[in-house]
Amino acid sequence: MSNNAVKSESQAVVSEEDELRAQLYEFLATLLRVEPTDAVVKKVADLSGDDTPIGQASSTLAHLAQKMDGTSVRNEYVDLFIGVGRGELLPYCSYYLTGFLNEKPLAKLRQDMAAIGIARADGVKEPEDHIASLCD
């Protein structure tokens, strides 16, 4: 038996589908966490897709990014998530479940994360129910 055929219990085997899913969620987190840089806008503009729903959405997103400059994209991000006083959308799960920020759903999420050994990353100021954190 080859060494490659034997896996220790500490090594996880991740399917290609799960790896691609993780990459997609990481990309979404990048888009939702902060105002996108010019490099991120370029990365979005370079996306390509296939005939699947996600592929079609990727192609549409790329097409839109090709038509916009970085400043316009950042302004849209600010309008959506920051705004004057408040953005058009609040990127926090608690708000959509209870109508308030930092409510029981956030406390439950923190308990669930602690139970499986996940903690908020050092330096992250947003609460764990921020959409970018959930995508991470």
Q: Where does each model-flagged region fall?
A:
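Surface/interface-facing alpha-helical segments and adjacent flexible terminal/loop regions used
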Residues: 1-136
